[in-house]
Design a protein with these regions (language model features):
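Mature N-terminal segment immediately following signal peptide/propeptide cleavage
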Residues: 71-103
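Bacterial N-terminal signal peptides
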Residues: 39-52
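His/Glu-based metal-binding/catalytic segments typifying zinc-dependent metallopeptidases
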Residues: 105, 290-369, 538-551
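Short, low-structural-confidence N-terminal segments
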Residues: 3-4, 54-84
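M16/MPP (pitrilysin/insulinase) zinc-metallopeptidase core fold and M16-derived inactive scaffolds
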Residues: 101-165, 230-231, 367-382
Length: 551
């Protein structure tokens, strides 16, 4: 045992020494002074509060400054020129920003997909960056990267496009890449098979989701067998049918200068834009036939355009809104954890009412403060994903409400959406709410065109819709001029109960009975029991008319 010498000169063990130390700690410091730890902490805290209070008295509270007055947004008027071969050259100049976004648009998209070839336009656009007569796919990517950009291609309903954003000094070679991709694609069989396999793999996952099936079904109920009614990305049945010959035929018919637009946004002037366009696209020639025209939708079944602000709603539109309703559709997805609710109405080409439709959509459901989000998410907690979308296509579009919710609450959500739509028809939007929504739209538009890519996107929307590019400058004024009366008249013309398509995808056992109880009593079908139709994913043939209820 280890020994230590005690104060009395006696040996002590380690244990005895530790006991002496403990006794000394309990006795406290010499002289009998005892320190209470809790009291010490309290004293220090009080002193700190006193210091803070003194500082607060020394520096009185200051009212934060008011928001600065709104600043007008300076937007140069876009200009349009044309090459001898018919190519339109549109420029949105942004002096001082040493970037340029270039887009080559072909005014043909998924609407020109032939019967039984859904997804053809999408595949064709995707393959534009997968090899040309002079460059492999990897060479295209390497050259774009060497210029500091990325060569991207895609197709929408009304257009196919290739785009790139580079510095001004790299625009010349970048336009060479764009021209090569659009004019000389090879549609190599190996690349076709690779892209087709990727899309099919994606569809396998997508088709297992309620949101995907609800969206596809809604499109079909909105547009029927007309071009907008088919899946733009294709289906598991249509994609395997598409051949390289199909791709080449579509390219010959629609990829031509008299059906194309070169959009440039950035630090460039008109003369420079036209010179570069002529250098890279001047030799482009289309077939020696009449200009290709994208297949147009037969709009007889859609309501006529809404009146401009200041006039009364047209009788034809009001009559269409009161027409017999389309059957409601439930898609039974057994064991689905949640349901997707979609309520949609068809819209004609909007024309002068684009701003009114945008404001109505903002009030209804386009942001966090909108009515749908306030009622369904914040007040009732029925969804984390609720909103509305305005889809303004060239030949008519739609307003869609989409909600992700529990299966058991799907019917309740449908009723809430119907109530909000009715509210827009029955009651003018209060002035404060209207002003807030318009301010949000104006601010969002200003932010969206801060970059050359955003400016180019706004310009593309106008060109594809067939709206004069000069309307870009008038966007803010048009939004600011929308009145509550105009919103209410638009709602009355297009949001009526007879125009609504209702689709719910999920575990139908949990919502079908309560949903069917809401379905309108009138029906355009011979059998009233067909006002509510339930399908399963296996029977939901989105290419075959006979599988669908009459519209």
């Amino acid at each position: 045992m280890k020994l230590a010498l005690s104060q009395r000169g006696e040996a002590s063990s380690d244990a005895q020494r530790r006991q002496l130390n403990c006794d000394a700690q309990r006795r406290g410091p010499p002289g009998g002074l005892r320190i209470n730890a809790r009291a010490l902490v309290a004293a220090l805290f009080s002193a700190l509060l006193g210091t803070i209070g003194s500082a607060a008295q020394a520096q009185p509270f200051e009212t934060p400054p008011l928001p600065a007055p709104p600043r007008s947004l300076a937007i140069a008027t876009p200009t349009e020129q044309r090459l001898p071969n018919g190519l339109r050259v549109v420029l949105a100049a942004r002096p001082g920003v040493r970037l340029v976004t270039a887009q080559l648009l072909v005014l043909a998209g998924a609407e020109v997909d032939p019967p039984q070839r859904a997804g053809l336009a999408s595949l064709a656009a995707g393959l534009l960056t997968k090899g040309t007569q002079g460059r492999s796919a990897s060479a295209q990517a390497r050259e774009a990267e060497s210029l500091g950009g990325s060569l991207d291609s895609s197709a929408g309903w009304n257009q196919s496009q290739v785009s790139i954003t580079v510095t001004v000094g790299q625009l010349n070679p970048a336009l060479g890449l764009l021209a090569d991709a659009v004019m000389r694609p090879t549609f190599a069989q190996a690349e076709l098979e690779r892209l087709r396999a990727q899309v099919l793999d994606g569809l396998k996952i997508a088709y297992s989701q309620p949101a995907t099936l609800a969206t596809l079904a809604t499109e079909r109920l909105l547009f029927g067998s007309r071009p907008y009614g088919h899946p733009a990305d294709g289906t598991p049945a249509s994609l395997p049918r598409i051949t390289r010959t199909d791709l080449q035929a579509l390219h010959r018919a629609h990829y031509r200068p008299d059906n194309a637009v070169l959009l440039l946004a950035g630090d460039l002037d008109d003369a420079g834009a036209l010179r570069l366009a002529a250098r890279h696209f001047g030799a482009w020639r289309g077939p020696q036939t009449g200009a290709a025209t994208a297949s147009r939708l037969a709009l007889a079944a859609l309501p006529t355009p809404a009146p401009a602000a200041g006039s009364s709603a047209s009788p034809a539109a009001a009559a269409a809104a009161a027409a017999a309703p389309t059957p409601w559709l439930a898609i039974d997805m057994a064991k689905s954890d949640q349901a997707t609710v979609m309520v949609a109405v068809p819209l004609p080409p909007l024309g002068a009412d684009r701003a009114t439709a945008s404001v109505l959509n903002a009030v209804l459901g386009s942001d966090f403060s909108s009515r749908l989000n306030q009622e369904i998410r914040i007040q009732r907690g029925l969804s984390y994903g609720v909103g509305s979308q305005l889809d303004a296509r060239r030949d008519g579009g739609a307003l869609r409400v989409s909600v992700q919710t529990r299966n058991a609450s799907a019917a309740e959500v449908v009723a809430l959406v119907r109530t909000e739509l009715d509210g827009l028809i029955d009651t003018p939007v209060p002035a404060a709410e209207l002003a807030a929504r318009k301010a949000a739209l104006v601010g969002a538009f200003g932010r969206s065109i801060e970059t050359t890519a955003g400016l180019g996107s706004a310009l593309r929307s106008l060109v594809v819709a067939g709206v004069p590019v000069s309307e870009l400058r008038a966007r803010i004024e048009a939004l600011s001029a929308v009145t509550a009366d105009a919103v209410q008249r638009f709602a009355a013309a297009y949001l009526g109960a007879g125009a609504r398509r209702v689709v719910v995808a999920g575990e139908a056992l949990e919502f079908s009975a309560s949903l069917q109880a809401q379905a309108p009593a009138q029906t355009p079908l011979s059998s009233p029991s067909r006002r509510f139709v339930t399908l399963t994913p296996a029977t939901l043939d989105i290419e075959r008319d006979g599988a669908w209820p009459d519209r």
